[in-house]
């Protein structure tokens, strides 16, 4: 599975901009909360910490991890032969959502502490969901015979 870094960082920017814009009781919230290109160094650290969290959660299934030149990150998992391939796309989406939510949670720990815990919990749940899907085995089907 590959997580496209540019897509994740775009979603992080959208999420932080939205959160900053929607705060009605704080005039400086948007400027404080919105993650910009100037914050890339810190966001890069959070990107790497999210990779580590995925590897830790999926360490029994982990075969390899690789980073591309453009910063994208790929992980190869060893899954059961009974793994339901229909879950692959859902796993990829959930993994991408984990990265966005995890990075936003870590960012909010600095600039929006009220929402940081909720985002952290959501990130944990997303990663657990990826792990559950990786462990899921499709029930065997009985062979059918033509009479």
Which sequence ranges carry the predicted segments?
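Amphipathic protein-protein interaction modules
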Residues: 68-111
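Short loop/turn elements at secondary-structure junctions
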Residues: 18-21, 30, 93-147
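Conserved short "hinge" loops at termini or chain/domain junctions
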Residues: 1-78, 84, 132-147
């Amino acid at each position: 599975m590959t997580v496209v870094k540019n897509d994740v960082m775009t979603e992080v920017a959208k999420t932080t901009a939205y959160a900053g814009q929607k705060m009605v009781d704080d005039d400086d919230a948007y400027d404080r909360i919105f993650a910009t290109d100037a914050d890339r160094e810190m966001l890069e650290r959070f990107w790497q910490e999210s990779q580590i969290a995925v590897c830790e959660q999926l360490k029994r299934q982990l075969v390899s991890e690789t980073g591309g030149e453009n910063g994208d990150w790929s992980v190869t998992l060893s899954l059961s032969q009974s793994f339901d391939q229909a879950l692959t796309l859902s796993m990829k989406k959930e993994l991408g959502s984990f990265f966005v939510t995890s990075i936003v949670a870590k960012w909010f720990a600095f600039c929006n502490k009220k929402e940081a815990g909720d985002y952290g919990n959501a990130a944990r749940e997303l990663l657990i969901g990826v792990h559950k899907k990786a462990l899921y085995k499709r029930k065997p089907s009985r062979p059918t015979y033509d009479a």
